[in-house]
């Protein structure tokens, strides 16, 4: 649902801006409690706006970002919930292979945050199997770098 006063392009711009703001906060080395709360809200707001103007790929990316945020702030149950929502979207739509690798990366990260190393290793292994199949070098490198952060 979007604000009735916003058009499609404005809603897309708002969703993208919120997504980018969330990334700024994720990348910040030290965050205040207020910034962590902002990070949660901006990820959810971005996901909400993409629901009305995006498609399955945008929805999956939004769920992926929500899961990543919850890993960052130490709420593994919420991270797993959003990672599984991402997986559902990816598996029920014809999305590129990098999306499949990405969802397994965030599942691994979420299970790691929950201290379930068996499931974390399983998900990381699946991501590692998919990375060589990603055709675009930049996408392949981005996901490989994210998986490399999983040092359990």
Where are these regions (language model features)?
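Residue signature of alpha-solenoid helical repeat architecture, marking inter-repeat boundaries
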Residues: 9-17, 37, 57, 98, ...
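Amphipathic alpha-helical segments of tetratricopeptide repeats
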Residues: 3-4, 23-24, 43-51, 84-92, ...
């Amino acid at each position: 649902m979007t604000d009735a006063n916003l058009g499609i392009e404005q809603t897309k711009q708002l969703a993208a801006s919120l997504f980018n703001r969330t990334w700024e906060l994720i990348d910040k080395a030290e965050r205040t409690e207020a910034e962590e709360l902002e990070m949660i809200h901006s990820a959810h707001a971005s996901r909400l706006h993409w629901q009305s103007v995006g498609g399955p790929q945008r929805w999956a990316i939004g769920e992926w970002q929500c899961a990543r945020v919850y890993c960052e702030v130490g709420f593994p149950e919420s991270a797993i919930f959003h990672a599984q929502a991402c997986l559902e979207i990816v598996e029920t739509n014809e999305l590129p292979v990098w999306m499949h690798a990405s969802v397994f990366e965030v599942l691994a990260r979420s299970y790691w945050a929950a201290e379930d190393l068996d499931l974390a290793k399983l998900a990381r292994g699946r991501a590692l199997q998919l990375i060589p199949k990603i055709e675009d070098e930049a996408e392949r490198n981005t996901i490989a770098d994210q998986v490399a952060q999983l040092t359990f």
